[in-house]
């Protein structure tokens, strides 16, 4: 009995150690991994982790602004946590993968605010990174707009819009409240 208990304790400690080692790191192994890591870091207000999602040693001012704006946006909502619903590829070619992420911001009152975001992801040295805004050409931007238009007809997107509308009906004036926090 004692050996079984000891083995159980060792197993639990091993699981805790392995889980702790994997927590909080940004995965650069897949386009979706870097996007999920970026959103989780934003929800936690982790500026440095968000910066690590970009490949540049020196981040452009646009990328820094995007990071700080995203953190400010999440803070305006009073985010406690983020629940990722789905994350996948909208389109891909040899230069980039266009990734969507559908997630809910868990608010202080335990309600979940539906969100959807898209990111362009590139591969560099066999790792995936977000495109900095300054790296996105007009050609890429135009193609992404066409791809997004198609994405808007998918079940993922229509489910998001329905969830968003339900949230707003339950919380009239919510958008104005957030806009006031962001502009004030």
For the regions a language model picked out, list residue spans one by one.
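Short, low-complexity N-terminal intrinsically disordered segments enriched in polar/charged residues
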Residues: 1-40
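Short solvent-exposed beta->alpha transition segments
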Residues: 24-27, 48-103, 111-113
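A short, surface-exposed beta-strand/turn
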Residues: 114-130
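Sec-exported extracytoplasmic/periplasmic mature domains
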Residues: 39-43, 55-59, 107
């Amino acid at each position: 009995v004692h050996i079984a208990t000891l083995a159980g304790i060792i197993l639990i400690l091993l699981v805790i150690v392995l889980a702790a080692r994997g927590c909080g790191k940004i995965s650069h192994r897949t386009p979706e991994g870097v996007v999920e890591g970026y959103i989780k870091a934003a929800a936690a207000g982790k500026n440095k982790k968000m910066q690590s999602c970009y490949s540049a040693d020196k981040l452009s001012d646009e990328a820094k602004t995007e990071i700080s704006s995203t953190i400010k946006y999440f803070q305006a909502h009073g985010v406690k946590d983020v629940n990722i619903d789905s994350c996948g590829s909208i389109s891909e070619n040899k230069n980039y993968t266009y990734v969507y992420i559908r997630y809910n911001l868990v608010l202080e009152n335990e309600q979940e605010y539906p969100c959807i975001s898209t990111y362009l992801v590139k591969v560099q040295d066999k790792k995936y990174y977000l495109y900095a805004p300054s790296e996105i050409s007009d050609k890429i931007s135009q193609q992404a707009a066409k791809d997004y238009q198609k994405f808007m007809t998918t079940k993922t997107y229509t489910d998001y819009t329905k969830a968003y509308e339900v949230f707003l009906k339950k919380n009239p004036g919510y958008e104005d409240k957030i806009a006031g926090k962001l502009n004030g």
